[in-house]
Amino acid sequence: MSATPDTHPAADAATHPTADTATRPANPVARKTIISGLSIHTQMSSVAGAPIVYLLGDVADNSPIQVPEGVSLVNVGVDLWEENFSPWCAPRVFAKGPNFGDGAQKTLDTLINQVIPWAESELSELPAYRALVGYSLAGLFSLWAGVTQAGVSPQVTRGCQPDNTPAATFQRIGAVSGSFWFPGLLDYVDQQLSGGAVGLTHAYLSLGDREARTPNPQIMHVRENAELLASKLQNAGITTTFELNRGNHFQNVEGRMQKALDWLVK
């Protein structure tokens, strides 16, 4: 479920070098930059081909979120969540909240065409897989992106001619306490999945067990929608789990994110 859409919890490809991987530093390589308004903070594993988790939210240098050794982490800080994570325009669900925009496609394009090439520019090999993980509206975006992403062949990222085997940008997604109540989401996911493979292999969905206990007529269906979405993804051949956590939307945000990451990279 999404928390107040106007409040976001704190959490905060590519060319490749010719250097031998044995010369790379033993500790993760950290870099920071801003790309098209997105704050990027990378901690890249020195292991060649290491999976990469793209974590949506506020970049936090001392984030308690941890990934195992041999997994890289890219924090992506995004402002104006109701605009930049919303896939299409929709009216506000809280009296004092903003309406939703339609900036998700622009955000996804920026991730694929600018953020990933920069973040992965010093890698010696493509990652084994990429995971996209977010909380609340960022979780909605992760799910939407997972069934929307356009595939590109691996050769394209290496500057070669494309073959006929497209590969999804993100193979795994985590939608943690996601805004599964968002209008039109169920129909959209149905439409995308009915078109064939979307490139996802794993999907993690979760909610707090009190998130649906609200008089808000839109949000009260969040658990029902989450369970339906998990079933749709599983039936499409995507390894999927739906987890209920104790509490409301704002409870133990970091712990819930950690559980998602642990499942996605196990």
Language-model regions: role of each:
Residues 2-5, 24-266:
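Non-catalytic cap/lid and distal C-terminal segments of serine-dependent acyl enzymes
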